[in-house]
Amino acid sequence: MVDKLTHLKQLEAESIHIIREVAAEFDNPVMLYSIGKDSAVMLHLARKAFFPGKLPFPVMHVDTRWKFQEMYRFRDKMVEEMGLDLITHINPDGVAQGINPFTHGSAKHTDIMKTEGLKQALDKHGFDAAFGGARRDEEKSRAKERVYSFRDSKHRWDPKNQRPELWNVYNGNVNKGESIRVFPLSNWTELDIWQYIYLEGIPIVPLYFAAERDVIEKNGTLIMIDDERILEHLTDEEKSRIVKKKVRFRTLGCYPLTGAVESEATSLTDIIQEMLLTRTSERQGRVIDHDGAGSMEEKKRQGYF
């Protein structure tokens, strides 16, 4: 008698198959590591795929210099514990221009420090495939993207120019200068991610758990006071509105552009229970998703992950 795979084991097997396919099919793949929960699961799956050997490709963090301090500490800890080959890239042009989310706004900051930074890094190292942790349930433009997402020589995505992926068969043929973005977690949901983290004991950034944190409400979004830089861009009136609230984060990005949610979830079981009851998107706290109608699709057309 053959035991049937559970839902999570089926997802795990599918993701591991995709990761191995890319490693075998492409000359120079890389795994993007954004330090969030999806990256943690994807990295865990990749390590399973090649255990007991090491990952046959590096991991890369495109750093905007505005991530939460806890994220940087967690990244360095994981790199040391897992012996990862980490590449960190910061857009030097953005640094020279002093780009930041306060002075230049979320759209320009994201374009220069994330999108252009990513394209620079991919070109610099000659990567022909890049793994990412995006899922179809996150956002409408990601819902119509394939597992193998083809990009032209300028890293642009054309949603009308995609290949069929019938019966889990993936066509990785690309012309010189072209590349693909690969999404092994495409068919996972946010709840799947949390249940898998719980079952596998995957370490995650503590920001996902509720705790008393200093926040300020700006345009209906709770922004955490993560370091002194944000205070330079607040008026005295805004500073007077900084309060302590028990909050956590469902998604993590640049801290001035990532909203917290009020929560009592201090453990993985609490978070899973919360996910079973919630009716809002995890990306509701991402300021960059509200830059305009179809903003995420437009960003992806320009090369954003």
From Swiss-Prot:
Cysteines engaged in disulfide bonds, as pairs: none
Alphabetized GO MF terms: ATP binding; sulfate adenylyltransferase (ATP) activity
EC number: 2.7.7.4
Any GO BP annotation: sulfate assimilation
Catalytic activity, as annotated: sulfate + ATP + H(+) = adenosine 5'-phosphosulfate + diphosphate
Biochemical pathway: Sulfur metabolism; hydrogen sulfide biosynthesis; sulfite from sulfate: step 1/3
Keywords carried by this UniProt record: ATP-binding, Nucleotide-binding, Nucleotidyltransferase, Transferase
Pfam families: PAPS_reduct
Alphabetical list of HAMAP family matching this protein: Sulf_adenylyltr_sub2
Listed PANTHER family: SULFATE ADENYLYLTRANSFERASE SUBUNIT 2 (PTHR43196:SF1)
Record family assignment: Belongs to the PAPS reductase family. CysD subfamily.
Role noted for this protein: With CysN forms the ATP sulfurylase (ATPS) that catalyzes the adenylation of sulfate producing adenosine 5'-phosphosulfate (APS) and diphosphate, the first enzymatic step in sulfur assimilation pathway. APS synthesis involves the formation of a high-energy phosphoric-sulfuric acid anhydride bond driven by GTP hydrolysis by CysN coupled to ATP hydrolysis by CysD.
Subunit: Heterodimer composed of CysD, the smaller subunit, and CysN.
Protein name: Sulfate adenylyltransferase subunit 2
Species the sequence originates in: Pseudomonas savastanoi pv. phaseolicola (strain 1448A / Race 6)
